[in-house]
Amino acid sequence: MTTSAAGRPLIPQPPSTVTALRQAVAQVSPAALPAFTRELDEAADQARQGSDLAPLQRFIAQWAAYVHIQRQPQLAEDLRRWERVAATGTAEEAFKAASEIGKILDATHAALDAARR
């Protein structure tokens, strides 16, 4: 991942479309492209089987949040650090980490919701 000056996002938040999100993932986290493609295929299959767009909507929301975080190197590092603590820390540390991860995800979803308005 490349860095940006003064803590600015590496790229603007893309529109919440499959094409735009794929391009953004390729820029901010190319190693995640196989997971993106696999999860898109799974969501499309579920949508077809159930004649329901909800799986694709969940996919887009999930990856929009992923891009929102990954395009901000410090935020992405904070999330990775808290994920490590949650996986390897004591019960008390894991509880704190879960709280911090929740705050990051809540702020991410709030920012994405505000941008849609």
What are these regions (language model features)?
Residues 1-5, 114-117:
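N-terminal pre-domain segments used for targeting or regulation
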Residues 2-45:
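Short terminal alpha-helical segments
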Residues 17-21, 49, 72, 90-93:
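Intrinsic-disorder/low-complexity, polar/charged segments
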Residues 21, 40, 56, 63, ...:
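Generic structural signal of hydrophobic/aromatic residues within well-ordered alpha-helices
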Residues 27, 42, 46, 69, ...:
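A structural signal for alpha-helix termini and helix-coil/disorder junctions
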Residues 32-75:
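Amphipathic alpha-helical interaction modules
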Residues 77-117:
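Amphipathic alpha-helical binding modules
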